[in-house]
Amino acid sequence: MKKTLGIIGGVGPLATMFIGEMIVRLTRATKDQDHVHTIIDNDTSIPDRTAYILDPTKENPVPVIQKDAAKLVAAGAEVICIPCNTAHTFYDDIAKASPMPVLHM
């Protein structure tokens, strides 16, 4: 049984599109229905991760990422991924708040 993948995007909009393309290209599919069911939330309003890491008085991106994960789960995602190296600095806080697994890079 295939799982539905939720992608928290916008933390590098091109990275979001790149991972989507790679998932399609690397899936061994002979027809459309063989592909991974994917839900993408390309949320470009997520505060700058690097700015917050360098200066914790800046806006914390974690609550927005957690909210996006919750939206994806509500939409049917059974596993979450975030195509952003910097966002994984906050992996523990994001994963702890998600009822579904969050893939780590």
Q: Regions from the language model: what does each represent?
A:
Residues K31-Q33, I94-M105:
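Short, acidic/small-residue loops that bind anionic groups at enzyme active sites
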